[in-house]
UniProtKB/Swiss-Prot annotation:
Protein name, as recorded: Uncharacterized protein Mb0911c
Originating species: Mycobacterium bovis (strain ATCC BAA-935 / AF2122/97)
Coiled-coil intervals: none
Pfam family of the protein (one): Glyoxalase
VOC domain residues: 7-133
Xref: PROSITE patterns: VOC
Domain of life: Bacteria
Length: 152
């Protein structure tokens, strides 16, 4: 029997406390837990969530699964990746994330590219941008706005 495979791109997050991270993502982003797999020591070696209609995977920091290195944002001194969520009612969703324990990285504001946009850091060091299109903007307008920002 053939298995139907849907191509997908899913972030796989490494965190210091996957069970707490799942609780946070449920509160902050209305995530739905799809499942979790604990390892012999009780750490989660795999978990999957549905956020904004897409799968996000995560696990506890298990260095032996990562070439012997700790791979959490806290152990690495930050994260070079921001996960973006396009949402409706971005003000409410941004505040919900803050109420759940996220901190502001970039304040929520209307941006020159047409989105109301801001960035939060979750308690585990991962960055999440939230945006909502609020006006249509073409590339020429964006480039003109960027050029005018350089004048001054």
């Amino acid at each position: 029997m053939a298995i139907n495979v849907e191509p997908a791109l899913s972030p796989h997050l490494v965190v210091d406390d996957a069970a707490s991270a799942i609780d946070f993502y449920v509160k902050a982003f209305d995530a739905v837990e799809l499942g979790r797999v604990p390892g012999p020591d009780g750490k989660l070696i795999h978990a999957a969530l549905r956020i904004n209609g897409f799968t996000v995977m995560l696990n506890d920091d298990v260095p032996q699964m990562c070439g012997g290195k700790s791979m959490t944002p806290t152990s690495l001194g930050g994260t070079p990746v921001t996960i973006h969520l396009t949402v409706t009612d971005v003000d409410a969703k941004f505040q919900r994330a803050l109420n759940a324990g996220a901190t502001v990285v970039t304040a929520l504001e209307d941006q020159l590219w047409g989105d109301r946009y801001g960035v939060v850091a979750d308690p585990f060091g991962h960055h999440w941008s939230l945006g909502q299109p609020v006006r249509e903007v073409n590339m020429d307008e964006i480039q003109a706005a960027m050029s005018s920002q350089g004048d001054g």
